[in-house]
């Protein structure tokens, strides 16, 4: 049997031997593409190459690309586990030609690989072509020798591909494998095509046209090839099975699930084991690529996938978290091909376990609610959207999990009602994924880059220099000149100004000409990653395209940014050393006055951890080692141990920053295009000022360096001295004195609370005299005792009412506590009276009088409150009225 790993390797070896560049899989989160939530096809990383916005140093390529289809237009989540070929995570094998070879060679490569390298019988193969693509029809006859009846013309859009309403497009040709007439189904294009007999294994897209806005198609000057083949599908064919879940990778994962749950993958439980196997792959790869579970965007899709698998683990009777215990089986199957799985294994395991523990806390309650809501329903009925939304909002059930849970009962869910409830609760504040990246409308940058090429950056070695103005942009349009008072974007052929990227803010400074033009630069951008755009305001003179200018960076501001940026590298290394290799940078902001650093870690840092990390960084600063820079290829840099940041896109040559010493190695080695100090002593001082949560599994540190850190510490010192003076003690004694005062205050508050409680119960006052307690009165057929007290802690209400109940003996006791204008109320009913009067009903009457809503508890004791403390006596009257 040919393993899935062997198939992947042989595909890449074949095309590598045919002169193709072998492109590693891109992360699942698309780089700078606001139109996609996840990479969902092999061509996605090459999209800008196909559209001409990006140039690569090769014209042919092949890859095995990780893909996820579980959100947006391409969403296979609902079908996973119940069909033979649907997955949330899959691998797409593909070969690509960017204006190099076209149809004939694409068909030749496909036929040679599947029939000669993989040995599929030609008589088992059928091809489809777009109904007007005579060229492809003839090529299949010529190259493969297929008879006319096994080259099927398809007139539908299934065999015509387009990137969108406009842009590259072209006909497709698909290759199908025939499992034989013992399997149900007919050939493509027939009424029985949805059966399992004929399985599509490869799609060849011939990009030969450009779709224009008016609907016209014109020939592309350099037609291209985009092919895609699902690895799981072709593995099933080559391994002689009809079901992707019977292939070696899935069999290993399902066997592990069976072993850990003790439940066989029989007809009743097969879907659950398949869901778990598929969703384990998707969840693990998403976490490895930097996505963590949350309640919005990509993180919410991940949470939906995880929780769907976790419900199926619950169906299998798993008493303890299961998913993280299956992870070793996944890394054994796929870790060699995707080493990021092994690198991120601790983080993946912790994330899976934490999410499953969290979900299990509400899963049983939610399922009970679902059972109650559907107890009287039958097949064909619909669960109302309000209940589905309550399951989502209260118990963490994504909508599709509720759908999945009701699938076996044949009950559907009211999607419109669910959406209406969601909209009503969250309204405009609902967090919808909006993507990120360059605005598609900013075509001007593409035009300028094509005309002038990339801006040469000279700022690594200098903060000033001469340049030529190559473009001026005002209000989004190119202009030839700018005058005093104009706000304009200035582009030059070269610049020492750093353009904002990699979390580092852009430089500020001045632009001047010998003729007297003078412009202040407030910021520098870097659109497309190639241009440097100076955001400037002309203060004097006239600036024209073609002028020679002197560019001067604000050096003092740049130095502070350098220090903060180098400190982020030291902090990153310290975090990984202290907390573990699962720590990865999730984002940063490097400004002149401060910096923040976001990183993956499942819990808050302790005070001791923060102190240790701070000490580690400052020790490196005191060591004052020089910062070294080398230019390397990305592969060489990573092989040498450099950290590459998730989501960053690197060119053919990268800067590798090494700084500090740890035993016989550098303390930190990272790929980075930013500006840095020359020696670590230039940072001077490092101080963490806050540590907080950004989202589930992501923490944020905010820190200061140099003079900003010194001023912050001085401010704390002054505050400490002021506190010491107010406390009439020395600064060293402030903590002990504050603790002493806090204990005294706590004691005084306890004594005051006891006094108020005693007063409410009619106990003795502070002067030793007897205080008149509340009088018991007869209301209707029940004894009733009520008291209104100012300042009694609401937490004391129930205990105090228990005391009042004893005074009543048999009847109802009520206490209203007024604090800061609000009122809290508790009502107690003695056991012999709960059959006639419920404390819950009585307290609800009181709460309405106080301007509140709700209130609850038990028949013998209930509590509530309202905003109108002035209506305390009205609340007493309301309870009396309810008793009368």
From Swiss-Prot:
Belongs to the class-II aminoacyl-tRNA synthetase family. InterPro entries: aa-tRNA-synth_II/BPL/LPL, Ala-tRNA-lgiase_IIc, Ala-tRNA-ligase_IIc_anticod-bd, Ala-tRNA-synth_IIc_core, Ala-tRNA-synth_IIc_N, Ala-tRNA_ligase, Ala_tRNA_ligase_euk/bac, DHHA1_dom. Zn(2+) binds at residues 565, 569, 672, 676. CDD domains: AlaRS_core. Binds 1 zinc ion per subunit. One of its GO terms (cellular component) is cytosol. One of its GO terms (biological process) is alanyl-tRNA aminoacylation. Catalyzes the attachment of alanine to tRNA(Ala) in a two-step reaction: alanine is first activated by ATP to form Ala-AMP and then transferred to the acceptor end of tRNA(Ala). Also edits incorrectly charged Ser-tRNA(Ala) and Gly-tRNA(Ala) via its editing domain. Keywords: Aminoacyl-tRNA synthetase, ATP-binding, Cytoplasm, Ligase, Metal-binding, Nucleotide-binding, Protein biosynthesis, RNA-binding, tRNA-binding, Zinc. One of its GO terms (molecular function) is aminoacyl-tRNA deacylase activity. Its cofactor is Zn(2+). It is an enzyme of class 6 (ligase). It catalyses: tRNA(Ala) + L-alanine + ATP = L-alanyl-tRNA(Ala) + AMP + diphosphate. SUPFAM superfamilies: Class II aaRS and biotin synthetases, Putative anticodon-binding domain of alanyl-tRNA synthetase (AlaRS), ThrRS/AlaRS common domain, Translation proteins. Consists of three domains; the N-terminal catalytic domain, the editing domain and the C-terminal C-Ala domain. The editing domain removes incorrectly charged amino acids, while the C-Ala domain, along with tRNA(Ala), serves as a bridge to cooperatively bring together the editing and aminoacylation centers thus stimulating deacylation of misacylated tRNAs. It comes from the Bacteria. It comes from Sphingopyxis alaskensis (strain DSM 13593 / LMG 18877 / RB2256). HAMAP family: Ala_tRNA_synth_B (MF_00036_B). The lineage of its organism: Bacteria, Pseudomonadati, Pseudomonadota, Alphaproteobacteria, Sphingomonadales. The keyword Cytoplasm applies. PROSITE patterns: AA_TRNA_LIGASE_II_ALA. Gene3D superfamilies: 2.40.30.130, 3.10.310.40, 3.30.54.20, 6.10.250.550, Bira Bifunctional Protein, Domain 2 (3.30.930.10), Threonyl-trna Synthetase, Chain A, domain 2 (3.30.980.10). Its EC number is 6.1.1.7. This is Alanine--tRNA ligase.
